[in-house]
Amino acid sequence: VLIIMGLSASHKVWHPELIDGLAAGGYRVVLLDNRDVGQSSRTEVKGKLWLAWQLLKYRIGLKVKSPYALTDMAADAVAVLDALDIERAHVVGASMGGMIGQIVAYDYPQRTQSLVSIMSTTWAKHLPPPGQEQEDGISNMNESSDEQAADLEELGFYPRALPNQVTAILNAGDRTERVRQIAAPTL
């Protein structure tokens, strides 16, 4: 089971009882840390003003810049499977991790045994965008001091990853048609 967490969160956020239960059920559990969080490599992280500018550009329909894409993060997930010599996996993702899981399932169908996409989205145009409360929460988390960031990292959250990961999400576009084509059992 390949388990992918969402925006700015590491594998530490998954509840140990879930992981232990899967392992006790005979599953090999692989907890993935996305780029810029946890035990994964770091990209040059953009700042608060850069993120605010990208969010404004997105709101008015302009192209958003991002250091990487969700498709890159899906390729990272498959590279982890390759490194562990795992041919096929049940893919479980939460929030942004669910988006990455969707991409794994339709770009790498031969590697996907099933998909569970938790509290995620296809980013369909008819769905409402994140509200001001969510954007404020992202901005506030991005403004954390070094001490606050260290405390959050201890819990598994990496606020400095927000600009890069948020812009990767904004650039991903509507995946509705691609998700409809997923052949693996999907929940």
Regions found by a protein language model. Name each.
Residues 167-187:
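Conserved serine/cysteine hydrolase catalytic core
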Residues 130-172:
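The alpha/beta-hydrolase serine catalytic core
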Residues 99-107, 113-142:
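Flexible "cap/lid" loop of the alpha/beta hydrolase fold
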Residues 28, 87-90, 111-114:
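Structural signature of beta-strand start/N-cap positions in the alpha/beta core
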Residues 56-68, 146-154:
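Short glycine/proline- and acidic residue-enriched helix-loop micro-motifs
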Residues 5, 89, 93-95:
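Conserved alpha/beta-hydrolase "nucleophile elbow" surrounding the catalytic nucleophile
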Residues 59, 64-67, 71-89:
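Conserved acidic catalytic loop of the alpha/beta-hydrolase fold
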Residues 1-58:
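Conserved HGGG/HGGXW glycine-rich cap/lid loop of the alpha/beta-hydrolase fold
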